[in-house]
Regions:
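Catalytic Walker B motif of ABC-type/P-loop ATPase nucleotide-binding domains
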Residues: 151-155
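Conserved ABC transporter NBD signature motif
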Residues: 56-67, 71-72
Length: 213
């Protein structure tokens, strides 16, 4: 699903990533951990084709995201840690997702409800004016409704309360055996039952890669 070979990213004289080699497969649930500055965000941005590597390569389902980003990202659903300041209403954002990804509005609304968000009550509100938890739940719902092969969550529960996190993790359980799930998170204990693999990063390197369960 995702193949990373000899990936390095240099900013000035500093290597944010150093010789990363990873192969992430379908049916895996992977957590990527590390202190701030360990290289986690740079790794995800490189996988998503947002940052061109200094050395090495990335393939998503065999596609180079730096040459065919739209093709590569058609396999990916991504939920960022900090929701972007989108200046669309909640309804308009959902319509955009429906048109661009061919998903059904009813499916997005249904997933929102599973996360205990009645998004219809907030259709007219601008996305950036929703609460942090509402934004996160809506983005999670859109990503899952897309039914991609790969789901990447960057601290997905950061803006969710305990009940919201519980609903989110429950929602992921049936997806475990169907997709590649990647979590960038410090909350390993909360999602331990979902995980099959742990990757630890430090100073731009993958210093530990182990199977779980």
């Amino acid at each position: 699903m995702i193949e990373i070979k000899n990936l390095s990213k240099k900013f000035g004289s500093h290597f944010s990533l150093q010789d990363i080699n990873l192969c992430l497969e379908k049916d895996e649930s992977v957590i990527i951990m590390g202190q701030n500055g360990a290289g986690k965000t740079t790794l995800i941005r490189s996988v998503l084709g947002e940052q061109i590597p200094t050395f090495g390569s990335v393939r998503i389902a065999g596609i180079d995201p730096f040459k065919d980003r739209s093709g590569a990202l058609s396999h990916v659903g991504f939920v960022p840690q900090l929701p972007p300041p989108i200046k669309l209403s909640a309804k308009e954002l959902i319509r955009y997702a429906v048109v661009s990804s061919g998903i059904e509005e009813a499916r997005i609304v249904s997933i929102c409800e599973e996360l205990e968000l009645d998004i219809k009550e907030h259709f007219k509100k601008l996305f950036f004016k929703l609460s942090g938890g509402m934004k996160q739940k809506l983005l999670i719902s859109i990503a899952i409704a897309k039914e991609p092969d790969i789901l990447i969550f960057d601290e997905p529960a950061a803006n969710l309360d305990a009940k919201g996190r519980e609903s989110f993790y429950k929602l992921l359980q049936p997806l475990q055996k169907k997709r590649l799930l990647i979590f960038v998170s410090h909350r390993m204990e909360e999602i331990k039952s979902l995980l099959t693999r742990k990757i630890e990063m430090d100073l731009g390197k993958a210093v530990n890669d182990e199977k779980l369960g």
